[in-house]
């Protein structure tokens, strides 16, 4: 019999005795398996808690780095939007974090979205909006996000967003990390798919309101090119219900070029 030592209570001594008492081999093996499983589970949980930030950091680095994007003052992009069999000229002008304007030319008319210092407006003759009309709510927030060059994932903490790693998923044969981002501003959820091989963004999924209805929109990013150390996807293909409804192809990108701020005013 084991006697109580080290000032332990009888109950504590009983627990010690259980560990000291020889156990049958099969029981030892069973206990060891449970301990090993518990340790591995804790290790996995710990790794998961760190992985989402590690994936985002690797993605940010692959794109050129958050600091580098934040140092860019202005951005000009030009290209074409392919929609319903038409190729429409597109221009985008951004003052990083402050202002954004994009123009699409359609049959001699212009569809314009603009944002500056918290206010936004739009013109869309094809939708009956022939003069500059203020935008509010989710649409205004979308314009504001477009004025920021860095992807919301890169500095999600500073913006107050929530992120969650949802595991891995194949996207058209590419193994990716799947990350859910919930916006602090409007609760909108965007899911990002980042390649496990080169840490580049392959696809994003979000909801968009079109003609009074909400649709899930998939955006695929391809033809990535380097401009002064920063990566840009020159082709962005958008699908809903598995069908392509729009494709944007940029033909030129200019960084830190003069932009007249008056173009953002109504």
Where are these regions (language model features)?
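Flexible, processing/modification-adjacent segments and terminal tails
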Residues: 50-61, 122-188, 209-215, 259-266
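Subset-of-secretome marker
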Residues: 86-88, 100, 106-110, 172, ...
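Bacterial Sec-dependent N-terminal signal peptides
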Residues: 1-52
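Short amphipathic beta-strand/extended segments with alternating polar/hydrophobic composition
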Residues: 90-95, 112-117, 131-140, 194, ...
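N-terminal mature ectodomain segment of secretory-pathway/periplasmic proteins
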Residues: 54-128, 164-165
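Short, ordered coil/turn segments that flank beta-strands lining enzyme active or ligand-binding pockets
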Residues: 118, 125, 171, 196-197, ...
């Amino acid at each position: 019999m084991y006697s109580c030592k080290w000032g332990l209570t009888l109950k504590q001594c009983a627990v010690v005795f259980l560990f000291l008492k020889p156990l049958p081999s099969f029981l030892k093996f069973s206990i060891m398996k449970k301990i090993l499983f518990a340790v591995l589970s804790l290790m996995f949980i710990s790794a998961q808690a760190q992985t989402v930030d590690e994936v985002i950091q690797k993605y940010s680095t692959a794109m050129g780095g958050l600091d580098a994007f934040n140092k860019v003052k202005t951005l000009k992009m030009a290209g074409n939007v392919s929609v319903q069999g038409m190729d429409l000229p597109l221009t985008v002008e951004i003052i990083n974090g402050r202002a954004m304007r994009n123009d699409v030319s359609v049959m001699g008319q212009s569809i314009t979205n603009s944002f500056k210092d918290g206010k936004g407006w739009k013109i869309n003759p094809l939708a009956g909006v022939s003069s500059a009309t203020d935008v509010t709510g989710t649409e205004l927030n979308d314009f504001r996000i477009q004025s920021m060059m860095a992807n919301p994932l890169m500095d999600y903490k500073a913006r107050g967003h929530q992120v969650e790693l949802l595991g891995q998923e194949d996207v058209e044969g590419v193994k990716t990390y799947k990350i859910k981002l919930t916006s602090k501003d409007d609760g909108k959820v965007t899911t990002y798919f980042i390649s496990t091989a080169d840490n580049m963004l392959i696809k994003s999924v979000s909801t968009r309101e079109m003609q009074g209805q909400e649709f899930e929109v998939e955006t695929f990013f391809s033809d990535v090119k380097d401009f002064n150390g920063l990566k840009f996807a020159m082709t962005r293909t958008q699908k809903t219900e598995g069908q392509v409804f729009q494709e944007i192809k940029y033909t030129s990108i200019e960084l830190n070029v003069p932009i007249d701020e008056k173009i953002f005013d109504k």
